[in-house]
Regions:
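Acidic-and-aromatic substrate-binding clefts and catalytic sites of carbohydrate-active enzymes
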Residues: 49-60, 81-87, 206-210, 244-246
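Short, conserved secondary-structure transition motifs
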Residues: 238-251
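N-terminal beta1-alpha1-beta2 module of alpha/beta enzyme domains
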Residues: 1-74, 177
Length: 269
């Protein structure tokens, strides 16, 4: 039977709005509020605290959040994958998983070509195959660190063969780090089903998209993974859909109008 998890997005900064261009200083992030937010999320019954990657590094936010004793998961939702080496991501994920007592859920996404090449100056290649190789490279590192076996991973995008003891973290009590990837198109959905523990769907989805695109391709990938079909119930499907909440009808109408522009933006990219 499927279970439902509720996520709380951590807010340690002030989101950019076009009005900020009219003058005035943009507020600095409030890192000191993160532990309070985790405590509040725990008290309110949330299952996961999520850090997104926009203006600030989500791994730093989770490092702070992990200092608050809590049973809830800590997740990146999402962190950009192609802007860094999979080995670098493997290191920070391993440390955060250890620091949090095994509570990390690693959410990754490819971003679009323009951001990867123009904002970060990194190369772009076939995103679905590259993401599959990226996840495989991370898991190869984690396996090497946990087992002590030599690192040996070869793929189209990444070849790893050096991990001396001086650079290998020690084994940990809970070595499995759940990996979710953001996916929209068929091939990336299949990669999520094949090599990941779950998927993060885009907010701009419809019931028809779920039934005709998302679910069939996730299942197709899952079947390729060789995992027993009984484990499909543990595959996490996160996100999907936009929700407007307001204290009265007038405020709700304004929120809906603002949401229309958000949907138009995503629909045009």
């Amino acid at each position: 039977m499927a279970t439902t998890k509720v996520e709380k997005v951590l807010n340690w900064g002030v989101a950019y709005t076009p009005e900020m261009d009219k003058g005035g200083q943009r507020p600095q992030p409030r890192w000191d509020t993160l532990r309070d937010q985790v405590r509040e999320a725990t008290d309110l019954g949330y299952d996961t605290a999520v850090a997104v990657e926009t203006q600030h590094d989500p791994f730093l936010a989770l490092a702070v959040a992990a200092q608050e004793p809590s049973p809830i998961e800590l997740s990146t939702g999402i962190a950009l994958a192609f802007t860094k080496s999979p080995v670098a991501t493997a290191y920070v994920a391993w440390d955060l998983h250890t620091m949090s007592g095994g509570r990390l859920v690693l959410g990754l996404g490819s971003q679009v070509k323009g951001h990867v090449t123009r904002r970060f100056g990194m190369p772009w290649s076939k995103p679905a195959q590259r993401m599959k190789d990226y996840v495989g490279a991370m898991r190869a590192c984690w396996h090497s660190w946990q087992s002590g076996e030599p690192l040996n991973f070869k793929s189209e995008h990444y070849n790893l063969s050096l991990m001396t003891p001086n650079f290998a973290p020690p084994p940990i009590a809970k070595p499995h780090i759940p990996v979710l990837i953001a996916a929209v198109q068929e091939r990336m959905l299949q990669v999520a089903g094949e090599v990941c523990d779950g998927v993060r769907l885009h907010g701009i989805v419809t019931r028809r998209y779920l039934d005709e695109i998302a679910f069939p391709n996730l299942q197709k990938g899952f079947e390729k993974s060789g995992r027993p079909q009984a484990e499909w119930k543990n595959f996490e499907i996160s996100g999907g859909g936009f929700l407007c909440v307001a204290p009265d009808r007038d405020a709700l109408a304004r929120a809906v109008e603002k949401m229309k522009s958000t949907i138009a933006f995503y629909g045009s990219t």
